[in-house]
C-alpha cells in the first residue's frame, strides 16, 4: 500500500501586499509551513509527497524562494521520498513556467496527456 502526503496551494512567494507590516511575517509563515510538510513526510516515512498545484504564487518567485524549495525537496529526496508536483493556476505551465526554467528534485507533470512513469530517486523527470 502506498503511503503518501498530499499538499496544495502553498503559494510560496505570495506578496501579501494588503498586509502592510505583517506581509513579511506571512511570507515567512508559508516557508515555515512548507518546511513542516517536508518534516512531516520524513517523520511519517511516507513514500510520496504529492503537491497538487500552486507550490509557488507565481512563475516568478524570488531566487531565495526557489533556493528554499530546492533545499527542502533535496532533503526529502535524501530521505528516500519521492515528490510529485503538479503546476497550478498561479504557477501554471506556460512558456516561462518556473518548472521549465528550474531543475527541481522530483517529478513535474508538464504534459496534460495521460502519463505513466516509474518514479525513481533522481532529478526531475519531464513527462514529455
Predicted regions and their residues:
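His/Asp/Glu-rich metal-coordinating catalytic cores
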Residues: 48, 59-128
Amino acid at each position: 500500500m502506498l503511503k503518501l502526503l498530499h499538499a496544495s496551494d502553498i503559494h510560496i512567494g505570495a506578496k501579501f501586499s494588503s498586509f502592510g507590516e505583517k506581509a513579511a511575517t506571512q511570507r515567512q509563515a508559508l516557508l515555515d509551513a512548507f518546511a513542516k510538510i517536508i518534516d512531516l513526510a520524513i517523520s511519517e516515512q511516507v513514500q510520496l509527497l504529492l503537491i497538487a498545484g500552486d507550490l509557488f504564487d507565481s512563475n516568478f518567485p524570488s531566487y531565495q524562494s526557489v533556493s528554499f524549495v530546492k533545499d527542502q525537496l533535496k532533503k526529502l529526496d535524501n530521505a528516500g521520498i519521492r515528490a510529485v508536483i503538479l503546476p497550478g493556476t498561479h504557477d501554471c505551465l506556460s512558456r516561462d513556467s518556473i518548472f521549465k526554467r528550474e531543475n527541481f528534485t522530483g517529478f513535474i507533470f508538464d504534459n496534460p496527456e495521460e502519463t505513466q512513469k516509474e518514479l525513481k530517486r533522481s532529478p526531475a523527470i519531464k513527462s514529455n
